[in-house]
Amino acid sequence: MTATWSVNKKIFLQNAITVKNNQPLMAVVKNNAYHYDLEFAVTQFIHAGIDTFSTTSLREAIQIRQLAPDATIFLMNAVYEFDLVREHQIHMTLPSLTYYYNHKNDLAGIHVHLEFENLLHRSGFKDLNEIKEVLKDHHHNQNAKMIISGLWTHFGYADEFDVSDYNVERSQWMEIVEALLSEGYQFDLIHAQNSASFYREGQILLPHHTHARVGIALYGSRPYSSLNQHDIVQSLTVKAHVIQVREVQAGDYCGYSFAFEVTKNNTKLAVVDIGYGDGILRTRAKHEALINGKRYPIRALMMSHMFVEVDGNVHAQDEVILYNNDIRIDEYTFKGVGANSEQLSAMNHDSLKKEYISNDC
């Protein structure tokens, strides 16, 4: 028996179609499409009617170009391999005045999207004046030069409801967009909304925008907890099996470093063939596993095993579900286990058996 990571292809595709909601999306496929596999995800998103993609890796951007020759591909990180960017017709962020002036000549022929820093402060121009400085310098540049195709930002607080920061960053961004458009500047692509913002706005684009730049929702995880589970459906299942069921007594310690102290006689512990070496986070192991439709508490986590406290209804070879649509990634995000993407990224695709299922199993 080998622990398995599996995706239902039909559910994945249908979720992408539902998330898209007939709106133009830029699908975020960074980090190997959130570890769902870049080729698989891009292919499914194309079937869902998505033809625009973004990533943080030039290597991935080139791979997307090979998969989708006619797609628009946006690189969210600035890079310095300008010839490769040109060769593969990759759009790229323009992250700062310094980068622009240092590489103005290198950027000739490359499509760039002007980036507004906003509240995240990770990258981008500080304010409207910096953006206009680039636009004016670019206008007067008589040499071979870059092609300004886009305008973008990232909302870092769209999933925060207890503070006003999303409203602040949204307002600041819209002021930038409207000021530039009112002065006659035009952009082929304007994008800012992540999954949380897209859903907060009712799955429609903000005014003047051409795309929403959606990531985690396309992979079946809700960006915030008040969304109904039926709105975003998880296609991923991570499962293992019971190797054996052990009976232990009050006062026994089970697992390394006294991980679990037994408090009742004749306690049953299922030994399960999955552990942190397969990508189960220790924070996730503070919660439950699903066996035969019932949740049971995980009591100890080891590299290749875990102990789950069970009852007489659990037997050797029973399936143990760590994640599926009934025990979801996003549920444990909201319980503090870690971000949706953190839990997905932890999965060890070298030790887990990887499957793509074509039916409704």
Curated annotation (Swiss-Prot):
Entry's Gene Ontology molecular function annotations: alanine racemase activity; pyridoxal phosphate binding
Active site: 30, 256
EC number(s) recorded for this UniProt protein: 5.1.1.1
InterPro entries per the UniProt record, alphabetical: Ala_racemase, Ala_racemase/Decarboxylase_C, Ala_racemase_C, Ala_racemase_N, PLP-binding_barrel
Modification N6-(pyridoxal phosphate)lysine, positions: 30
Domain of life according to the entry: Bacteria
Catalytically driven reaction(s): L-alanine = D-alanine
GO biological process: D-alanine biosynthetic process; peptidoglycan biosynthetic process
Function as written in the Swiss-Prot or TrEMBL entry: Catalyzes the interconversion of L-alanine and D-alanine. May also act on other amino acids.
Protein name as catalogued: Alanine racemase 2
Gene encoding the protein: alr2
